[in-house]
Amino acid sequence: MSEQQLLTEREIHAFGIHILIKKLEEDGWIIESADPGADRATHPQIVGHKDGEIGFFVVRTAMYPGKGRIEGEEVFQNQVLHAGKHGAACYFASLGIASAAGESEEAKSTPVKGVHYHISFDGLVRMSLPEPKVTH
C-alpha cells in the first residue's frame, strides 16, 4: 500500500479560498481577484463586488476539529483598516474541513490529498472596529 500524500498548510488555505469563491459566486458576488498567497496579516484573500458594494474577504481554513481563526487583534485591525482605505467592507470566513473518508477523529483531521471533504462554514462575519468613545 502506498503512503498517503498530505495537503500542506498552503494547500489547505487555498482549498478554503476556492470553497469561498464558489459560495460567493452563488450568492451573486463578482470576484475581481483571489490570492491564496496574499500577506495574511494585511491583505484579503478575495476581493469582489455585489450591488455596488466592494467586499474584502479574509479567509482562514483549518482541519477538523478546528475552524479557521484570525491570528490576533492586530491582524483583525489591519484587515479592517486596509479595507476601509479602499472603500470596501471587510468580511471574515472561517472554514473547517474534515476528510469524508475518515472514520476516526484522527482520520477526519488528516489532510489527505485526493479525497472528499466535509465543509463547515457558518457564513460570513462582517468585520468592523468599535466606534471611538467621545469624551467631554
Regions found by a protein language model. Name each.
Residues 1-35:
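Acidic-basic catalytic patches of nuclease active cores, encompassing PD-(D/E)XK
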Residues 13, 18, 49, 82, ...:
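Histidine (H) residue identity feature
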Residues 17, 42, 75-76:
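Amphipathic coiled-coil/heptad-repeat helices and related helical stalk/stem segments
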Residues 36-40:
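A short beta-turn/loop motif at secondary-structure boundaries
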Residues 43-48:
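Short acidic loop-to-beta-strand element that houses the catalytic metal-binding Asp/Glu
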Residues 49, 53-55, 59-112:
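Catalytic cores of nucleic-acid endonucleases
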Residues 108-136:
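Glycine-rich, aromatic-bearing surface loops/beta-hairpins
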